[in-house]
Amino acid sequence: MRPDHRMGPPHDEEPHMPETIDAVPEIDDLRREIDELDATIIAAIQRRTEVSKTIGKARMASGGTRLVHSREMKVIERYIDALGPEGKDLAMLLLRLGRGRLGY
């Protein structure tokens, strides 16, 4: 066995690349779509956070609590129903963005 085989193909050989040249433009298009979706999602999260903070301030100004546990549980349930178990983590993050961490 030649020593250079331990480190990969000999230096005069190109590593084998699968034929994916035709897929590159499609991948680029899909990545652009993901970037656009991310921008839309970020804008929606920012707006959701603003609305949630406004609701919290209004509730506290009228003598209520900053949050309503039953409402938060419905939000978490909605995300779990739509996205599966991972939806819980996303819902909790969105709730925290809108009201801040509990106990802090």
Curated annotation (Swiss-Prot):
InterPro entries: Chorismate_II_sf (IPR036263), Chorismate_mutase-related (IPR051331), Chorismate_mutase_highGC-bac (IPR010958), CM_dom_sf (IPR036979), CM_II_prokaryot (IPR002701)
Span of domain Chorismate mutase: 23-104
Domain of life per record: Bacteria
Keyword annotations from UniProtKB, A to Z: Amino-acid biosynthesis, Aromatic amino acid biosynthesis, Cytoplasm, Isomerase
Regulation: The formation of the complex with AroG activates the chorismate mutase activity.
Gene Ontology biological process terms, A to Z: amino acid biosynthetic process; aromatic amino acid family biosynthetic process, prephenate pathway; chorismate metabolic process; salicylic acid biosynthetic process
Binding site for chorismate: 59, 68, 72
Site (Important for catalysis): 59
Feature type site, description Important for activation via AroG: 100-102
Compartments, as annotated in UniProt: Cytoplasm
Keyword Amino-acid biosynthesis in record: yes
PANTHER family per the UniProt record, alphabetical: CHORISMATE MUTASE
Quaternary state and interactors: Homodimer. Probably interacts with AroG (MSMEG_4244).
Name assigned to this protein: Intracellular chorismate mutase
Organism: Mycolicibacterium smegmatis (strain ATCC 700084 / mc(2)155)
